[in-house]
Amino acid sequence: MKITALIHDCSLDGETGYAATCVEFPEANGQGESVEDCLNDLRAAVSEVLTYRRSSIFETLAEGERLETLQA
């Protein structure tokens, strides 16, 4: 799966490091001293969002519904 990261250089705000938000999953954010660290943190956040969404969907399945995993 490919995701889009919006990366902010925090030095423009007088701070250090970088912050990123995932365009497709705006609740997933990352930060780090380098762009690489920031993106790794964002990847982990996206993974956590997906894990949470997948686990919580089981609570809403109606009788006769099932989940299938697809490769996007």
Annotate the PLM regions.
Residues 26-37:
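A short, exposed loop/beta-hairpin motif centered on an aromatic-Gly-Thr core
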Residues 10-11, 31, 43:
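Intrinsic disorder/low-complexity detector
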Residues 8-24:
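Short aromatic-glycine-(Arg/Gly/Cys) micro-motifs in beta-strand/loop hairpins
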Residues 3, 24-26:
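Short amphipathic alpha-helical segments
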Residues 7, 21-22, 30, 64:
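Short stretches within intrinsically disordered, low-complexity N-terminal or propeptide regions
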Residues 1-6, 36, 40-72:
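Short, charged, surface-exposed hinge/linker loops at domain edges
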